[in-house]
Regions:
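Glycine-rich, acidic and aromatic/proline-enriched surface loops and short helix-turn segments
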Residues: 6, 27-30, 56-63
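Non-catalytic C-terminal accessory modules of carbohydrate-active enzymes
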Residues: 65, 112, 125-132, 149-150, ...
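Catalytic cores of carbohydrate-active enzymes
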Residues: 35, 41-153, 194
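Single conserved hydrophobic/aromatic residue that forms the stacking wall/gate
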Residues: 1-9
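Flexible, solvent-exposed coil segments and beta strand-coil junctions
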Residues: 12-17, 85-87, 137-139, 182
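Well-ordered alpha-helical segments within folded domains of soluble proteins
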Residues: 27-36, 98-107, 152-161, 200-206
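Hydrophobic, small-residue-rich alpha-helical packing segments that form membrane-like cores
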Residues: 12-16, 22-30
Length: 300
């Protein structure tokens, strides 16, 4: 098809192909999901083709600006791009918010950006670079922390990316801030559009202390639990338990992790661990600490 031949969706004029950039990034993730399914079905040739297509996100990365940018029908990056702007090239978001939409290959995105240090700097900027006070934001940009828009779902996984660069305490800090300040027990308690339940789903996962950055990977990046004890009674008859006995609004930082009583050194849990009825214990404190082994392997 045309998209595959061009390796991305292009704009023949400013608004000819609405959301061309965000479509390119999201289709690359869709292709990855197809590849995973094909691999499970033993369709190796199909899997290889769609794994290749899932790398098309690299075709809209501009190393001159370090952002994803739309291309015109000649293949050139469209002039006048600013990551702050909300344009027809990106669905209800700006260049800051869609830059991270490579859930299938975060390690590859880190390399593309220039390595862990540069990626960490860009993450910091995402949460500290505030819109101008006189800037009138669109109605979907709510729950803002810097350029992070919790009220609009494309940003939801970004908080958990600090795990990938050895700074999990920042994931814990921002996850706690969002849970405690942007969700209220009121009739208008959500800071944005629920959109098929995603605002609530983010909260439920994050309150348990983890979140599926790449939902088809079978991994859940560890954040910070909200409650001292959570139990999931599973359909297979087993019970998955999360314990954090000393967690409170100050003790948001994980000091150590045990799974089934054994020390655990990763910044993610697996679907298999959950379904096995594991018990995860978090030792919490008010002091940030590095935990886990990071950047050790590609996403599955």
């Amino acid at each position: 098809d045309r998209r595959q031949r061009q390796m991305c969706i292009r704009d023949s004029s400013y608004n000819a192909e609405n959301w061309s950039l965000s479509k390119t990034l999201e289709y690359a993730y869709d292709d990855y999901c197809i590849a995973r399914l094909a691999e499970k079905l033993g369709e190796r040739q199909v899997a290889d083709e769609f794994y290749k297509r899932s790398q098309n996100y690299k075709n809209v990365y501009n190393p001159q600006t370090s952002f994803m940018q739309p291309r015109d029908d000649k293949g050139a990056f469209i002039d006048g791009f600013s990551p702050d702007d909300y344009t027809p090239h990106i669905c209800e978001s700006n260049g800051w918010q869609y830059f991270w939409s490579v859930q299938q290959d975060i390690d590859g995105l880190i390399v593309l950006t220039g390595g862990k240090e540069r990626f960490a700097q860009k993450l910091d900027s995402m949460f500290t670079y505030r819109p101008a006070d006189d800037e009138e934001l669109p109605i979907f940009s709510t729950g803002m922390i810097g350029q992070y828009a919790h009220g609009n779902e494309p940003s939801h996984h970004v908080i958990y990316l600090f795990n990938k660069v050895g700074q999990p305490w920042k994931t814990q800090k921002y996850a706690s801030e969002v849970m405690r300040e942007l969700y209220k027990n009121t009739p208008a308690g959500l800071c944005g559009n629920e959109d098929c339940g995603q605002m609530s789903a983010w909260y439920v996962f994050s309150a348990m202390g983890f979140y599926p950055v790449n939902p088809v990977s079978g991994r859940y990046e560890i954040g910070t639990p909200l409650f001292p004890e959570i139990k999931l009674h599973l359909a297979n008859g087993k019970t998955f338990t999360v314990l954090a006995p000393n967690v409170n609004k100050e003790n948001i930082y994980i000091q150590s992790i045990k799974v089934d009583g054994q020390p655990y050194d990763k910044t993610y849990l697996t679907h298999e661990q959950i379904m096995s009825g594991a018990t995860v214990e978090f030792e919490m404190s008010n002091t940030p600490k590095a935990i886990g082994v990071i950047f050790e392997e590609k996403n599955p």
